[in-house]
C-alpha cells in the first residue's frame, strides 16, 4: 500500500512540526517541564530526587533524534517508528499515572500557558498521533509533484497544526477548570 505524496508529505511535515515544537517547548520552559517530570515520577512511586534532569536531557535528545530522522526522506521509516514509539511511551506514562490517580499534574503539552490535568482523552490523542506517525513509514506513491501539490501540502500542514493546537486548547479548557476545583 502506498499513499499519495500529498497525504504522506503532510503527515511527515506535521510530525516534524510536532517534535520541533515539543523540543522548543521543553527548552524554553525547562524548569516547568522538569516540574512536570517530577509529577510523573511520583506516579511511578520513584524517588524523583536527581532523576528529572537526566530524564529531561534524555527526552530532549530522543526528540531531537526523531526530528533529525523526520528531516530526511531516506529515514522516514525510522522516523515513523521512533516517533510512534515515543508517543506511545508518553501515553503509557500518562496511563500509569491515571491508573494511580495521579492526575493533578500537567500533561507537559501546553507551552506553560495553561495546565492540562491528565485525562483519558490525552491517551486517545497520543494514540492517534502515534498512528499518524506510523503512517509515515508507508511507501510514497511515485508521482510528480506540481505547484498546486506544493501549495496543497503547505495549506494541509498549516491546517493540521491549527487543528492540533485547537484540539489541545479545547482539551485544556475542560481540564483546567477541574484542576482549579481540585
Can you say where each PLM-predicted feature lies in the sequence?
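Membrane-interfacial helix-loop segments of redox and metal-homeostasis proteins
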Residues: 1-182
Amino acid at each position: 500500500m502506498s499513499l499519495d505524496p500529498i497525504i504522506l508529505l503532510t503527515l511527515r511535515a506535521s510530525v516534524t512540526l510536532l517534535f520541533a515544537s515539543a523540543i522548543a517547548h521543553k527548552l524554553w520552559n525547562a524548569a516547568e517541564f522538569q516540574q512536570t517530570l517530577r509529577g510523573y515520577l511520583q506516579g511511578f512511586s520513584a524517588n524523583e530526587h536527581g532523576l528529572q534532569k537526566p530524564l529531561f536531557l534524555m527526552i530532549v535528545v530522543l526528540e531531537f533524534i526523531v526530528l533529525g530522522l523526520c528531516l530526511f526522506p531516506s529515514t522516514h521509516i525510522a522516523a515513523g517508528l521512533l516517533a510512534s514509539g515515543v508517543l506511545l511511551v508518553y501515553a503509557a506514562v500518562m496511563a500509569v499515572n491515571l491508573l494511580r490517580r495521579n492526575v493533578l499534574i500537567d500533561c507537559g503539552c501546553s507551552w506553560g500557558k495553561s495546565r492540562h490535568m491528565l485525562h483519558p482523552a490525552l491517551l486517545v490523542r497520543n494514540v492517534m498521533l502515534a498512528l499518524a506517525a506510523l503512517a509515515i513509514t508507508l511507501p510514497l506513491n511515485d508521482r510528480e509533484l506540481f505547484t498546486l501539490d506544493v501549495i496543497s501540502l503547505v495549506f494541509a500542514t498549516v491546517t493540521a497544526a491549527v487543528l492540533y493546537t485547537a484540539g489541545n486548547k479545547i482539551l485544556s479548557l475542560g481540564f483546567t477548570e477541574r484542576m482549579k476545583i481540585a
